[in-house]
Every structure is written in structure tokens, then in C-alpha cells.
Amino acid sequence: MRFQTAHTPNSLTEGPIAQTLIAFALPLFLGNLFQQLYNTADSLIVGNFLGSEALAAVSSSGNLIFLMVGLVNGISMGAGVVIARYFGAKDYDRMQKTIHTLLAFGLVAGALLTVIGMTLSPVMLRLMDTPETVLPNSISYFRTYFTGSLAFVLYNICMGILQAVGDSRHPLQYLIISSIVNIALDLLFVGVFHMGVGSAAAATAISQLVSMSLCMIRLMRSDRAYRVNLRKIRFDGRALREILQNGLPAGLQNSIISIANVVVQSNINQFGAAAMAGCGAHSRIEGFGFLPVTCFTMALTTFVSQNLGAKAYDRVKKGIRVGIFCSVTIAETIALLIFIFSPKLIGLFTSDAQSIAFGVMHERTTTPFFFLLAYSHCMAAIFRGAGKSTVPMLVMLLCWCIIRVAYVTFAVKFFPVLRTVSWAYPITWGLSTLVFTLYYFKSDWMHAFEKRERRA
């Protein structure tokens, strides 16, 4: 089969760097904004229609859900680096094999997640010290959410394929459609039919099925080199090794962060449903606020990977400087707005005064340090794009898992207040910033990539 192989429309290897990054990141931002909208719709609608305990049930499931899907999504992210590198090098045969191997992996992983999520949810939620008053709703939400695991995994894979070749416009369109579907179903199931917490998760699962279907149809009907043929979905040994080599560290990084956050959430749970609801509302706000930074780092990963594949090493260095500057500047601007309007923002999710007080305190402790979080994510994106995804995994393991867990385990014993738990985030963001900076300037990662490519 012959494909159109015009390179320029989706390539990040040409054109002014700042404009190229922004043009690619903007649809990513809008797409992720709508994704956050349908994630947040569950919390907003559940909190306002069903009360703070129902909101606590949704919030307590969040970190556990990310733990379950983080490994798979990280592997998909790492595979996107491989696809982007082959796209930059114009090696379309290897790109095709990588794409179809990744889809085969997604089918297996999605099925496994469904089984694990459905069967082990009560055990996992109890291990998190979820209060008994919240537990039934948490189990209902968690189990229903995981009925859509296959669609969720395949959508993220298909979206990653499109983004790896520089197409951030179509994923945006599909996310807008699925977000509208999700919010409409949330209002119908919870607001009109009063079907309970589980129906909010059902709305999310249905909307994910819609976005996955649209994304898959786009890939199957494409005449480009990244076209998907269902008959070619199978495992290729070399492609699978490359996917796991680049993706497994990224997946483990996601899981590492999630494990630490589950421990932090367990400590928050000990302060009761009001603390759970307030901090859960903050996590939704943080998800929105940090979106522009997340999208710049996603763009930076693809930019670095494509340009390294094209051997444009000077362009990589310039792109890194632009990406870090934009990300840090945006992060602190958003942090200031969240800090100022914190009570009103938390109040959107719950009218309970104690929940609002907990949420505002947590928010105003963490947001001033968003620049550290932004910088760390940029560094992780750079090394991931260079195929050195083990570096961010190890940094996150040390700073965001081991040290964070050790801190909350011991600090709360001596200072048993929620603010002590909140400080776990700024402290570990600062440590990861320090470690990443030392490695970036002291190691020879760029030349190591050149040598590896010459050997290949």
C-alpha cells in the first residue's frame, strides 16, 4: 500500500520554534481542557446534586484510578516517542509495525484492567482507609468506571499516535464531542434520574467509547503513513521491545507517582469526609490550572523526539529553552490566579464550609510552588523525548515516591494536621527540580543519543 508521505504539515522539525511549539500545544491544551471538563463534571454534578459524601467517594477513587491506568498510559506515551522518532527519520515501515504492535498491546492491557478494576476495587479502597460512610459509593464509582477500560486505553493509544506525528487537531475535535456527551449524560443520570454515584462513572465510560471510536475511524481512513489496518494488529518482537524499553519506565513513573499519591490520600482520608471533599476539589482545580503546562511538556516530548530523529540537535536545544520558559511563566501566572480566587473555586464543588476551608488551605499551600512542578515536568519530557525515560522514572521514584511517602509517614505523627500533608508536594517538587538540573548539566545525554543512533 502506498501512503501520502508529505512531511511538512505535521512535522515539528521545520519552522520557527516558538510558533511551532505553540501551534502544536494549543490544540493539545484545548483537548485536555475538554478532557478535564468531563472529568470535573463528575465532581461538580455529584457534589451539587448528591452532597459532600458522594463527592468524597469520587475524590477518593481518583488517585487509585490513575494508579491503575497510569502504567498503561505511560507505556503508550513511551511508544509515542518511538513513533515520533521514526516519523522524524521518515522510516515509515518501522513506524507501521510500532503502531500495530501498540494497538495489540492496548487490547490486552484494556481487558486486564477491566478484570482487575472490577474484582479488586473493595480491597484496594479499604487499603486506602476509605471511611465506611464513603466506601459503598466509592466501590460503585470505581467498578463502573473500569467497565470502560478498553475504550479508555485504546483512545489514549490512538490519540498518542496522532500526536506523535504532529496531529493535535483531530484529538481536540474528538475530545470536544466526548466532553459534551459526558456532561449531558452526567446531568441526565445524576440530575434528572437521580441514579447515584455509579451513573457518573457510566457517563464517563460511554463518552470514552465515543472518543475512542472517532479516533480509531480517523486512523483507519487516513491515507498517511500512520494508517491503521485492523488485519495488521499483531505483536512485532522488535517493536514491542522498543515500546517497552521507552514506555515501561514512563509507565512505572506514572505508577510511582500514583502510589505516593495514594499514600498521601490515605493520610487525607484520616481527617474525614470534609478533608477528602476539599482536597478532592483542589485536585480538580489543579488539573485545570496545570493544563497549559502539561500540554507544553507533551509538545516538548514530541518536538525533542522528532528533531532528534531528524538529527537537528541545535534545534532541540533551542526548543528546550523555549519550552521551559513558557511552561514556568504560565505555571506561576495560573498559580497566582488560583491562590487569589481559591475560596470561590472550591465553593463551586461544595457548599460545606468545612470542606471549603480544608480545600483553600491545601490550595494555598501548594500553588505558589507550581513553577517547581512545571520545571520538573519539562525535564521529564525532554529526557523521555530523547529515549532516556529511565531518568525521570528514577528521579520520580526517589523524590516523588520514596521521599514523599517517608515524609507523610513520619511528619504527620509529629504534626497531625492536614497542612503537614499538603507540604509533601512542594518539598518533593523542589527536590526533583534540583536532581533534574544537576543531571541535565552534568550528564552527556545529547551526545549519548548521537552515539546510540550511529550504532543503530
Predicted features and spans:
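Helix-terminus/linker motif at the lipid-water interface of multi-pass membrane proteins
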Residues: 33, 37-56, 125-132, 188-195, ...
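Small-residue hotspots at the loop-to-helix junctions and early N-terminal turns
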Residues: 52-63, 142, 201, 273-288, ...
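Transmembrane helical elements of multi-pass membrane transporters/channels
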Residues: 23-42, 144, 155, 178, ...
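Short runs within selected transmembrane alpha-helices of multi-pass transporters and secretion channels
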Residues: 76, 144-163, 171-179, 200-215, ...
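Transmembrane alpha-helix boundary and packing residues in multipass membrane permease domains
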Residues: 28, 32, 44, 48, ...
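Residue-level signal for short hydrophobic patches within transmembrane helices
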Residues: 14, 18-37, 41, 64-71, ...
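Short alpha-helical transmembrane segments in multi-pass integral membrane proteins
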Residues: 1-25, 83-150, 192-248, 304-369, ...
